[in-house]
């Protein structure tokens, strides 16, 4: 019988209230994250997802004062009783604004910052820095200044900077916030590649769900009003109405399927457009729906774009 792994992150009846607020931002959180998992934590603005992340990496309560109840264990340590410095040895965080993490004058200096603080010998420091840069594909930019880099390249530098500590947990706080869709896909590909190479536990805090699902995740944890509403596989979550009901835009191909009258179930494997299982009846419904839509070059602002929906027709193998 295979022994079940112990969670690397464990919330037990955990609540957190910022000192400046009258009521808790997080209430009754129970959640286990296991070693090697890649988990998306999704929720609308103000849902509590960033507060959840801040409790994991130590920003709460050490940079943002507040009180907690319950228990939060991160890689074997009590997060609420540990210093932010101690937690940084377990959790590496890449912020949505990588400019806020730059410290060195060059890419190489920035990646090596934590090594300098720990008095790593020069030869070892160069070796580790080079390896981290190669791992994220930024090795040819070590002499560049931060302002010479694109948004995606800055994110790679931030990632390399936290990986030199060989942390077990990587936390990405809205990594797509400042990236266009193409750069966003590259970022998700990089995160997926790093996770596979290192077997690191990865948490992605993000509301751009379709972009994150460009690569597989093990689970999606849906947060709203400071509580966990769902902890499901992508296939199971996308077969519900929970995303729409909580202000998260579901993937556009899912919207197209719903408009066409298709019953979306987990058995149809809806997590990725190119792997959706559609029988002949479903395919006919989609073709008929696409054919019946008049093309309108002027679509209402904020509406689901028919043009974008149409772009998924090929992905759905129609």
Question: Where are each of the predicted segments found?
Answer:
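Conserved ABC transporter NBD signature motif
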Residues: 65-77
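ABC ATPase NBD coupling module
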Residues: 78-92, 117, 237-238
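Conserved ABC ATPase "signature" region
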Residues: 123-141
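Conserved ABC ATPase signature
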Residues: 145-149, 153
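ABC ATPase C-loop
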Residues: 162-163
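Catalytic Walker B motif of ABC-type/P-loop ATPase nucleotide-binding domains
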Residues: 170-173
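Conserved beta-strand-loop-alpha-helix hinge in the C-terminal portion
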Residues: 227-253
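Conserved small/polar residues in nucleotide/adenosyl-binding loops
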Residues: 307-314
């Amino acid at each position: 019988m295979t022994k079940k792994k112990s969670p690397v992150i464990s919330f037990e009846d955990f609540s957190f209230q910022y000192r400046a607020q009258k009521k808790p931002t997080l209430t009754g959180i129970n959640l286990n994250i296991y070693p090697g998992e890649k988990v998306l934590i999704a929720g609308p603005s103000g849902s509590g997802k960033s507060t959840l992340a801040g409790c994991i990496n130590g920003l709460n309560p050490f940079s943002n004062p507040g009180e907690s109840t319950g228990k939060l264990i991160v890689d074997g340590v009590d997060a609420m009783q540990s210093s932010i410095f101690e937690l940084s040895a377990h959790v590496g965080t890449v912020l949505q604004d990588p400019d806020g993490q730059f410290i060195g004058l060059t890419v190489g200096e920035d990646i090596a910052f934590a090594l300098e603080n720990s008095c790593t010998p020069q030869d070892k420091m160069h070796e580790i820095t080079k390896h981290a840069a190669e791992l994220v594909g930024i090795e040819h930019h070590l002499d560049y200044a931060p302002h010479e880099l694109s948004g995606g390249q800055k994110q790679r530098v931030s990632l390399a900077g936290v990986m030199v500590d060989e942390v077990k947990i990587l936390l990405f706080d809205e990594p797509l916030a400042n990236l266009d869709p193409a750069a966003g896909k590259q970022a998700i590909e990089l995160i997926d590649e790093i996770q596979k190479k290192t077997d690191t536990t990865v948490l992605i805090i993000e509301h751009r769900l379709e972009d994150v699902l460009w690569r597989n995740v093990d689970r999606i944890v849906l947060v709203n009003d400071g509580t966990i509403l769902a902890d499901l596989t992508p296939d199971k979550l996308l077969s519900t109405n929970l995303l729409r009901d909580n202000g998260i835009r579901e993937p556009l191909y899912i919207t197209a399927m719903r408009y066409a009258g298709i019953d979306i179930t987990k058995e149809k494997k809806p997590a990725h457009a190119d792997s959706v299982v559609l029988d002949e009846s479903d395919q006919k419904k989609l073709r008929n729906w696409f054919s019946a839509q008049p093309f309108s070059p002027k679509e209402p602002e904020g509406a689901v774009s028919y043009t974008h929906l149409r772009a998924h027709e090929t992905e759905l193998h129609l």
